[in-house]
Amino acid sequence: KIISREERCLNYLQDTVKTVYKVLRKTEKYMAIQYDYINEILPHDIFFITTKELEDLYPDSTPKEREYYITKEKGAVCLMQIGDLLASGVKHDGRAPDYDDWTLNADILVYYPVLDIALELSSMGIRVDKEALLSQLDKAGCPERANLPFQKAIIDETLPFTIGGGIGQSRICMFFLRKAHIG
């Protein structure tokens, strides 16, 4: 989706997450009406936290363990700012340097009691602008990518600012049907 320069901010990302989460809750409500064995488990609101804040909460845990602990506690979590190094010197998770802005991206995670896991339902982000792209290419050790056609178009500011992401269709089906696997 094309956005304005002013919309390249945390508030816009969080508003987008809230919109997606509202649809997830409506879908769960519908499924609970249709199927007797399905109960609503998603909390009313999604909990927002950065990877830095999460590492500060659980400094002795792995990134996946941190996701599990916070998601089990909160029910639904928007984990933001994925891709850069944390205070520990490691990344929470890898992200391409020329895709999402690492300061403006997020995963939607829900606690899934059927498998006792943190289940990622969506990954999204405001895409890199010139400054974020150059910084992230440098941090990733691949500044030469700045000469590739797509990356050059971002640097030359000939492409619009955008936000995008994906929904894990199989995971969504598995979650809403309360199944251990789909397929």
Language model: regions and residue ranges:
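Class II aminoacyl-tRNA synthetase-like tRNA-binding/catalytic domains
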Residues: 1-4
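Short, conserved charged micro-motifs
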Residues: 6-11, 131
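A conserved active-site cap/scaffold subdomain adjacent to cofactor or substrate pockets
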Residues: 9-28
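Alpha-helical scaffold segments that mediate packing/assembly in large oligomeric complexes
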Residues: 24-61
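A translation/RNA-centric and nucleic-acid-associated enzymatic feature enriched
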Residues: 52-183
